[in-house]
Structure formats: C-alpha cells, structure tokens
Amino acid sequence: MARVSYSQYGMYSSCQQQYKLNYIDKLGISNTNIHLIFGSAMHETIQHFLDVMYNVSKKQALTINLDTLLFDKLVEQFNKEKEKTGDDDPCTQAELGEFYDDGKKILKYFTSKLDKLYTKSGFELIAIEQRLNAEIKPGVHFIGFIDVLLKDKVNGEYVIIDLKTSTRGWNKYQKNDKVKT
C-alpha cells in the first residue's frame, strides 16, 4: 500500500522531480534544524496545556510552568534529532536560546489570549495528534495528523486546529494556495 503525506503531496505538486529524487530514489537530505526542533517542542507544550485544560481544568492547566515545559521539550527534541544525525548538533546553543526566548513570548501571548483563542464552554477536546488515514485511490492512502480536534457540543461541528510556529506569517498567495488550505 502506498502512503502519501501532506508534505509529500506538497512537494509533488510543486516539483515532481524533487519528489522523485527524495521519495523514490531516496536521495533526500535530512532537514533537521532549529525550526523543526522548536516547532515540535512548541506543539507538545501547547498540546499538553490544552489536554489538561479540557480534560482536568483550566485552573490546573494555568498552574503548569509552560516556560520550563518548553525548555524540557526543546532539550528532548534536540537530543532526539542529534541521535538521528550522529555527532553533529542539529542547531547551535545560541539558536536554542534565541528560539526559547521567542517561545516564552509566544506562550505568554497564548495564555493572555486563552479565553479568546480557546474556550472550554460548549466545547470538548476530541483528540490531540489525531491520525488521518484516507484512501484517495485504490492502494494509495493519504496520511496526516490533526494537531487539535475540538467538538462544539451545541451543533456537533468539529473544529480542526493546525498549530503553526513559522517565523513568518502567510502572504495572500499562501493563504489562497489550495494545497495548503
């Protein structure tokens, strides 16, 4: 059975030769960097907070030291990526420090806008990192993950949240790109 992820589909849509070299010929290069480490650490930090908020209480979630949790997740992700690359560090200590400082600011903003961004009233947390596996044609499956999945208790609609940690926002072309949205 063939499997296609969102990133594979995106690469194929933009450059079929790059897709062939990377996924068929297996000539791809590891892209481990601070952005991957930071994105994974920030996702895990926010997802843990939301899990506690929706499944225990908002009060309990607000007692979590998010800065410490983010630091621990950054170290964990750094070590995980370092194992993959051997002795080479996936990023510098300076990059880790800079991104950690940015992450603390993001988390401060996140908690200050919590009531506007995430309401507990009328919503339930269905899943974090919900795996998707849909057959898009016989023998080919699209695979992916939903970062956060909420359900509106009143109308039964689902809210899909895709956490983003890009250093740049999307321009109007990216927002209108049907591959991305």
Can you annotate each of these PLM segments?
Residues T45-I128, E135:
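A non-catalytic, helix-rich entry segment at domain boundaries
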Residues V4, I34-I37, E95, V140:
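Generic detector of ordered secondary-structure context
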Residues F123-T181:
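Mg2+/Mn2+-dependent nuclease catalytic core
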Residues M1-S14, V140-K151:
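An acidic intrinsically disordered interaction segment
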Residues D25, L50-Y54, D115, L150, ...:
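Hydrophobic/aromatic-lined pockets within catalytic cores
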Residues M1, Q16-I29, E81-P90, I160, ...:
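Short amphipathic alpha-helical segments and their helix-coil junctions
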Residues Y9-G10, S14-Y54, Y100, K104, ...:
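Nuclease catalytic cores
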Residues G28-L36, Q93, N171-K178:
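Short, charged/polar micro-motifs that form catalytic or ligand-binding hotspots
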